[in-house]
Regions:
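Amphipathic alpha-helical segments of tetratricopeptide repeats
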Residues: 6-19, 51-63, 92-107, 138-139
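C-terminal structural cap/anchor segments
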Residues: 129-139
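"A position-specific structural signal for the A-helix of alpha-solenoid helical repeats
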Residues: 26-36, 70-80, 84, 113, ...
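Large, well-folded core regions of big proteins
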Residues: 38-39, 43, 47-50, 54-60, ...
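TPR-repeat structural position
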Residues: 2, 44, 88, 131-132
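Residues that mark the junctions of alpha-helical repeat units in TPR/alpha-solenoid scaffolds
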Residues: 2, 20-23, 27, 64-67, ...
């Protein structure tokens, strides 16, 4: 499996904390790259380890916008995992859990992140067969 090599990469980052910038943009970028790769490969069972690393980053004393980006990333990767494994009800519940601390602050996020959040939401509702604009799609 690919995951042990990726876990070793993250361990390397974590063992060299003195080299990580504040905020740790390269570390965040590495985690997101790994999660993107796991998503594309359909290795959803490998994602929780790396999502937990994102959660640990939330404990840092960083700018509000940076922490919000981390929060959005956690949501996106959890959400895509649930949607792509057919766990639509759990994905819908997750959306509700993030309403106050993510979606109500969506204007503070980068445009690219906002678009990803809206796209994931649209895909979820299409998979739930909720009509959006009169269209229905089966997932």
């Amino acid at each position: 499996m690919l995951s042990p090599v990726l876990q070793e990469l993250i361990t390397l980052f974590e063992s060299n904390q003195h080299l990580i910038l504040n905020p740790p943009i390269y570390y965040l970028s590495a985690l997101k790259g790994i999660l993107d790769s796991l998503h594309l490969a359909g290795l959803y069972q490998e994602m929780p380890f790396f999502i937990d690393r994102l959660r640990k980053m939330q404990q840092g004393d960083y700018a509000t916008e940076f922490l919000l980006e981390i929060n959005a990333s956690i949501y996106q990767y959890e959400q895509v995992s649930y949607i792509n494994t057919g766990k639509f009800e759990i994905a819908l519940e997750l959306s509700g859990n993030y309403e106050d601390h993510l979606f109500k602050k969506i204007g503070l996020l980068r445009l690219e992140t906002q678009l990803k959040l809206y796209l994931n939401t649209a895909i979820l509702y299409l998979c739930l067969e909720e009509p959006i604009g009169g269209f229905r799609i089966r997932c």
